[in-house]
Amino acid sequence: MAQNKQKVSLIETRLRAALFRECLALVEDEVASPEDIDTVVKNTIGRRLAVGGPFEIWEQIGWDLVQTIAGELFKEISNSEEPVRSLRNMVNSGQLGVETGSGFYEWSKEDVVEIRHRFDGSGSEDSVGGAHR
């Protein structure tokens, strides 16, 4: 059982890291704002992944189309090995998110209570996530 938990943790951590890196790159490259990304993830990817895993989704799309899409998109996806400048600047200036009241978003006390309540009740293993309304 412990080995299975380790495997699940490894998979989850790596998938989150890939999504995290690309989200930061989209903001850094001024392709989208944090709000844009949160909205898209909550209303598209998140909903799809709640009912089917990536391979189940790709099986429905068809591997020929997935291969074509991957051939184009993979050229554009970040492969940076370092955190983006905007993230380093925020951390260096003490903007740590909910903990300090600011990050990519400004957090009032009411916002902090709301986001913690939302994530605590979501079934997520995280007590606090990075989404904002």
Report each predicted region and the residues it spans:
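C-terminal alpha-helical interaction appendages
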Residues: L24-L26
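NAD(P)-dependent Rossmann-like dehydrogenase/reductase catalytic/cofactor-binding core
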Residues: M1-K7, E28-D29, P34-R133
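Structural/interface elements that position substrates and couple domains in central-metabolism enzymes
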Residues: R16-E22, K42
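Short-chain dehydrogenase/reductase
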Residues: S9, T13, A17
